[in-house]
Amino acid sequence: EQVFTVTGGGAMFLNQSLGGHEKLRCTFMHHEQACAMAAEGYARIAGKPAVVMLTTGPGSVNALNGVYGAFTDSIPMIVISGQIKRETCISFNDVPGMRQLGDQEGPTIAMASPVCKYARLVRSESDLEKMLPEAYTEAISGRPGPVWLDIPLDIQQSTQVINIAPALLAEPKFDTDKLSKSCREIISKLSASNRPLILGGTGVRLSG
């Protein structure tokens, strides 16, 4: 429902598509870091993730500080960045020793992966059929956090029709034996204490 963005040439078709969508509200910012931090605040208040839409290279790098904050605080966030066209992108070409091939190219996914639950470079239009639902599910399931999709410019402008299935919330995974043991330990310690103090963290909120 909510998109925070700074427009840029590397994301021009994303800008057009999301910015003109009647069911999406786009808020245009002055800096990409502000986009990520606004998305974090939105998720805290609304209880659901917002989209951060970025351009390639420096635009994506600028957002990493806010994305890292969401990662450490378990806040869901969906980051969609533009990447240069595949023809001039190092990830699609064998050019040993080069650090940059295209204009304002950056190793976006390599930088985003350590601070995201899910980070993928979209290599073809059909990748989106799988990656979009996977990314959304990962963002909101289990311990929430940011996810990142990097989409080359020529894929952005493609007119190929794709079918994207609805994302599903992943089933929580519990080890009932460990949970029972932990509960018994907590009860034992509470019973033996005189003035117990309980510090509730984010996990309490996430558990519902």
Name each model feature, range by range.
Residues 1-208:
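N-terminal alpha/beta PP-like core and its mobile active-site loop of ThDP/TPP-dependent enzymes
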